[in-house]
């Protein structure tokens, strides 16, 4: 990706406006999951080390534009950064200019409260741009949205660059999708083929093998002519599944774990894939399938993982995802994982340090995998050329 990188710039004495992703869950004024803040701290430290006058902003939740409410405030993020030892303050009225002292971080209040943010109003983009000498886009999770703080500001700022987080994300995705070391294996889980159809189509042109899981696998099992009982599947997409299976190596499970109801207490029965009864639902792959797929992963050189292979939230239907997770963790392949359920599985099985790259962007990750252009990246590339 040909973008200017923040790491390559001289920022001494420069006013630097960082668009981060600090959209963290907050309860009773306290941050309840700090992963996104922790991921942003190295970028803030780097800007300070380079002698920049640092401003950082983000969206938080879904406020109504033009109406500020206390629950939409980034104050809990400011409190967190203070506790982490930063000299930091919150600025609510910043569109007409901000005074930033050396060594301090000024957090600019929730961008989504500003009128015109979501529809990328150029006048708002110009106001953001006027605050800085250098704009740093470091929020991969919002890179698929053209908004005033992700796109407009990059259009008008004197210099627009990618922050370390965004640059690392683009490098990792490029490594997995543009020129992957082979064999390249993709794991695509989820409840519906329809929501991952573009992902499957795009990966069918790149991957040597695609492992499908969850409700998606059920549609492929039905397409192979097996009874899926009361399982979640999409009958109308069986022709699509057949076409994908004809043109791509998509192994269908040979055995499955079934239950009579979708509940944590439902008993799990393992059976051969062609023996599912009408009153049963498939909630996981069986041991034999999991071991076969683990072997495929073991021999891979690149693994892209998006989605579990079973209802791993329920202990009885967790084993398939657990075996696959550990196969990825123990593999020598370059592995990249993304998507909320995938990250939850990584946390559950304690393998975060064994995945080469964990993507922070849900929707943006999927759109990149689909081969779509991410507007916030596109404008950085355009600015790098000028």
From Swiss-Prot:
Q: State which Enzyme Commission number(s) the record gives.
A: 2.7.2.3
Catalytic activity reads: (2R)-3-phosphoglycerate + ATP = (2R)-3-phospho-glyceroyl phosphate + ADP
Question: Where is this protein chiefly located?
Answer: cytoplasm
Recorded GO molecular functions are: ADP binding; ATP binding; phosphoglycerate kinase activity
Question: Which sites bind substrate?
Answer: 21-23, 36, 59-62, 112, 145
> Does the UniProt entry include the keyword Cytoplasm?
yes
The name under which this protein is listed is Phosphoglycerate kinase
Gene assigned in the entry: pgk
